[in-house]
């Protein structure tokens, strides 16, 4: 045989869990002749694609890293003083290495299972406390997608809390960032809110006005005293929202103190790279009386079964997974990993450190202003924090721009000929000297920053100075050395179960392992350091990645075009529905406003449709879990003139490939509607079927599911929208960077390409696997799910099966009989799984009283068997209750989870042994994960809502009364 010089180190062998021998054993257990035979049995022939993926061949890990390095070298990372909500920042290496690059943090899931997420919950509580302190308000959430969408959420919240049915006008200051203005206007239009962009002094708070939005400081840097605006708004029963620079609030009066009812903004400059637009965590704070209207996740303090303090996600009944179309927002994924980074930045620097950073940035700005004044230019605003708008004298904007480009400096250029300069913590005296040269001296003198600074007083002395303290909690005043912070972060990580411990079999979440080689490029400063509004010629590397990834994903899905602007799957849904609306309007069919949504759909679907101004009609499912075709036809016929869209998920959320999906699409098209596919389950389709081929018009993809961007404990995510050719003209645009179709809908996110930095991960993932590896991944995902379903069916019923008695990439375990007969429910099983070292599958969705299991392709047979053993042992524990050996309340299931403190206590009065509690099967001994709190009390936490860092005496409380008292007096 001839020598083969090609590399044998293909990545699919690293990514796929089962070995060839494992595959054979699993197929044998399933009675399947081959992997292809299993796939053929699971997927209807009618939707299988006949065309293999036309993608580049797989590369090795080193080849992908080299390709990423080459692409990064094409970016020009100039010094960007553009501002507009994005700044250079120093990411402390201790945070970069121990949070951003640490799989114990980035592979976690959203902390629904609080007992095994106390570390992440504490980090997010720190984030909320930081937000509350700096904004001067009472409550905050645990992050939103970006500043612009947070401002839109604030508008919607204030509209909800306003009791006047005819109040539908919202003022937006013309001094807000342009991307914020556009996103707010775009969000308002579908739901009938009239946005008026105006100067704040001209706001007219009539009876039809429910609120306004201000920027603090303004987009061009001015610090205004807005107390009069707030007073006028409140006198008219209107509300005030403020988009504030978080670092500036260490020096400026907190908006909550001068009348703001909601404050939003970005935490990007708290140690998170710009990344050509994201991802970054937005913050959201408001008044306590609006607590049940807050969008997104909130972390709150509660107690556990022993009365000890614990943390959990609070007020979940606000959210889309419970309230569906009546939710406060469609938000699901947020920006948890970035919120953790920002909170650790505040913990690391503390209040004094943050004030020092802000003061230094302001001093640099003051020095720049002095120099510009001496050169004859005029700084437009007397009061500023770190941004100047310069009216030029004896120089044109073109001349300044030419000199700036010669020095590789980006500035902001206004239409009126003025120039903007926004400084940040990375600026030094040499940067100021370069800026003096760029602006030029009218009298020929050369200026030096150090000389100017010697004659100036340090500190902020403008209007609205901050008088109140902030970040006084011990957590912000204890970990300022690298050693202390490292240990603190490690102590939190140790409390959280992630993929470094075991598989996370969450249905519809696709918790696959994330290739390290795919994540490595995001730390490259040539990608991380780029401003999203830098000239496009400076972003050639990004343009290459975006263009190539666009081609890969359209090839995989069969669509024609794509936009990466949506920062989450829910945002992608909303975008797709707006595109459908724009399409109907362009055809003169504005009356089409009905959206058909199956009852099995993700909660984000009806929530997104409502946000898009559509009327949601729910379609029944039949006894097999499929969309009820008769009901679909009936509703489509009854609403034929108004039908805008139907939203489907494929494979269905019931874990099967419905055989009549093409017929569903045909019915909708016959009545003039468009078909939207929720791409949450595309991991079962890549290389096997293409959504466009079976009739879908538009879909979103979850790059944080199928294409291996890690979940980060609840974000970041990317939800790009893929469109058929007839919908492509309506892809979202952007007010600053040209993008989208020629009839584009407004921007739906702050940055033109959304969270561009992490697109690198999916780009690298596809390159690593190539067409054969991607297809094999889908097949292996089906194999793993069918093997698990087969093994678990010996102990539990599987609710739905598809063609030939097979499931798709996920399936539903039925626990309902145990609830009705034994008072043992899905939550009891979920908590007991923690003692076995596993995160629970998805609970009570899409069928109440069940668990939905998705193993993904990256789990080995050994890991699948560990999960089977755990479920089998739990079934035996249930049987002990069935036979009367134990009462349900005395069983391991009702008492779970068991902490180390509990099982090592001097007294043990349980009806089972300590060993049964802690080490129920032998495999647990090899890698025991200990929950750090007992079962949390959700009801107590919601009754006694507390969303900030608790006082020190709360940690010492032994009884419920002591904890309640400590929280109420804080």
Predicted regions and their residues:
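Conserved phosphate/anionic-ligand binding catalytic regions in large, soluble enzymes, centered on
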Residues: 272-285, 289-290, 334-338, 422, ...
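A conserved hydrophobic secondary-structure block that centers on an alpha-helix together
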Residues: 130-151, 165-166, 170
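Active-site region of PLP-dependent enzymes
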Residues: 303-338, 736-759
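N-terminal export/assembly segments and adjacent metallocofactor-ligating motifs
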Residues: 110-120, 126-128, 141, 145
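General small-molecule cofactor/ligand-binding pocket signal
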Residues: 140, 194-198, 380, 412, ...
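Non-catalytic terminal extensions of PLP-dependent enzymes
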Residues: 1-29, 41-81, 90-106, 112-115, ...
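Conserved PLP-enzyme active-site core in the AAT-like
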Residues: 119, 149-310, 372-376, 389-390, ...
């Amino acid at each position: 045989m001839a020598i083969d010089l090609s590399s044998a180190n293909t990545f699919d062998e690293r990514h796929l869990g089962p070995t060839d021998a494992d595959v054979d054993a699993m197929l044998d257990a399933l009675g399947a002749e081959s992997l292809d035979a299993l796939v053929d049995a699971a997927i209807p022939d009618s939707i299988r694609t006949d065309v293999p993926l036309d993608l580049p061949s797989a590369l090795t890990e080193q080849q992908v890293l080299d390709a990423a390095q080459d692409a990064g070298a094409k970016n020009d990372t100039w010094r960007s003083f553009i501002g507009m909500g994005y700044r250079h920042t120093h990411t402390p290496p201790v945070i970069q290495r121990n949070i951003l690059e640490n799989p114990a943090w980035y592979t976690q899931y959203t902390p629904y299972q609080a007992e095994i997420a106390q570390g992440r919950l504490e980090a997010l509580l720190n984030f909320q406390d930081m937000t509350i302190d700096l904004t001067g308000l009472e409550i905050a959430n645990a992050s939103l997608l970006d500043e612009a969408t947070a401002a839109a959420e604030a508008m919607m919240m204030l509209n909800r809390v306003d009791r006047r049915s005819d109040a539908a006008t919202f003022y937006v200051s013309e001094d807000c960032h342009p991307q914020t203005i556009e996103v707010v206007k775009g969000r308002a239009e579908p739901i009938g809110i009239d946005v008026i962009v105006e100067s704040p002094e001209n706001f007219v708070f009539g009876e039809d006005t429910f609120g306004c939005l201000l920027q603090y400081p303004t987009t061009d840097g001015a610090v205004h005293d807005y107390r009069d605006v707030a007073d006028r708004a409140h006198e008219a029963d209107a509300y005030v929202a403020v988009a504030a620079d978080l670092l500036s609030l260490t020096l400026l009066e907190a908006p909550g103190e001068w009348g703001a009812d909601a404050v939003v903004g970005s935490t990007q400059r708290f140690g998170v790279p710009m990344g050509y637009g994201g991802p970054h965590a937005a913050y959201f704070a408001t008044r306590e009386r609006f607590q049940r209207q807050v969008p997104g996740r909130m972390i709150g303090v509660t107690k556990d079964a022993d009365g000890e303090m614990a943390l959990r996600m609070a007020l979940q009944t606000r959210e889309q997974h419970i309230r569906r179309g009546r939710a406060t927002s469609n938000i699901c994924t947020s920006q948890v990993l970035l919120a953790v980074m920002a909170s650790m930045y505040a913990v690391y620097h503390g209040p004094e450190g943050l004030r020092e950073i802000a003061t230094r940035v302001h001093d640099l700005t003051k020095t720049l202003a002095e120099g510009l004044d001496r050169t004859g230019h005029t700084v437009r605003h007397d009061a500023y924090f770190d941004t100047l708008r310069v009216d030029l004298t004896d120089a044109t904007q073109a001349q300044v721009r030419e000199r700036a480009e010669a020095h590789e400096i980006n500035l902001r250029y206004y239409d009126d000929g003025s120039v903007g300069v926004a400084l940040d913590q990375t600026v030094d005296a040499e940067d100021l000297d370069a800026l003096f040269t760029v602006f030029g001296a009218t009298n020929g003198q050369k200026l030096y920053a150090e000389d100017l600074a010697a004659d100036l007083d340090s500190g902020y002395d403008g209007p609205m100075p901050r008088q109140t303290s902030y970040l006084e909690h011990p957590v912000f005043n204890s970990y300022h050395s690298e050693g202390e912070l490292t240990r603190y972060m490690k102590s939190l990580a140790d409390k959280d179960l992630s993929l470094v411990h075991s598989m996370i079999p969450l249905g519809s979440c696709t918790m696959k392992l994330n290739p390290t080689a795919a994540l490595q490029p995001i730390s490259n400063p040539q990608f991380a350091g780029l401003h999203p509004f830098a000239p496009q010629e400076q972003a050639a590397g990004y343009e290459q990645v975006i263009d190539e990834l666009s081609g890969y994903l359209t090839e995989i899905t069969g669509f024609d075009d794509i936009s990466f602007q949506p920062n989450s799957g829910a945002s992608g849904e909303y975008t797709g529905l707006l595109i459908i609306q724009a399409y109907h309007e362009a055809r003169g069919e504005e009356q089409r406003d009905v959206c058909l949504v199956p009852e099995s759909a993700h909660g984000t679907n009806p929530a997104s449709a409502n946000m898009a101004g559509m009327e949601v009609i729910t379609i029944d499912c039949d006894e097999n879990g499929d969309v009820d075709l008769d009901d679909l036809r009936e509703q489509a016929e009854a609403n034929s003139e108004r039908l805008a869209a139907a939203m489907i998920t494929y494979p269905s959320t019931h874990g099967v490939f419905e055989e009549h999906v093409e017929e569903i699409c045909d019915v909708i098209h016959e009545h003039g509607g468009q078909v939207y596919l929720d791409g949450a389950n595309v991991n079962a389709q890549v290389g096997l079927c293409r959504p466009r081929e079976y009739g879908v018009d538009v879909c979103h993809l979850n790059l944080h599911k199928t294409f291996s961007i890690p979940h980060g404990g609840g974000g970041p995510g990317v939800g790009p929208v893929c469109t058929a050719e007839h919908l492509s003209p309506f892809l979202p645009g952007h007010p600053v960077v040209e993008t989208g179709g020629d009839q584009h809908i407004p921007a739906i996110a702050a940055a033109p390409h959304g969270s561009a930095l992490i697109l690198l991960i999916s780009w690298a993932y596809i390159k690593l696997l190539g067409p054969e590896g991607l297809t094999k991944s889908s097949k292996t995902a089906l194999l793993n799910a069918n093997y698990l379903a087969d093994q678990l069916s010996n102990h539990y019923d599987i609710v739905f099966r598809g063609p030939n008695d097979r499931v798709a990439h996920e399936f539903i375990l039925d626990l309902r009989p145990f609830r009705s007969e034994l008072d043992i429910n899905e939550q009891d099983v979920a908590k007991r799984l923690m003692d076995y070292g596993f995160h629970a599958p998805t609970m009570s969705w899409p069928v109440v009283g069940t668990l939905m299991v998705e193993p993904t392709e990256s789990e080995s047979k050994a890991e699948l068997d560990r999960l089977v053993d755990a479920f089998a042992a739990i079934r035996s524990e249930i049987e002990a209750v069935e036979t009367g050996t134990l009462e349900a309340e005395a069983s391991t299931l009702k008492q779970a989870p068991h902490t180390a403190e509990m099982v090592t206590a001097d007294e043990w009065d349980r009806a089972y042994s300590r060993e049964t509690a802690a080490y129920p099967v032998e495999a647990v001994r090899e890698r025991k994960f200990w929950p750090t709190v007992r079962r949390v009390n959700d009801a107590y936490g919601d009754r006694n809502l507390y969303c900030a860092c608790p006082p020190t005496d709360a940690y010492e409380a032994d009884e419920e009364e002591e904890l309640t008292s400590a929280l109420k007096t804080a």
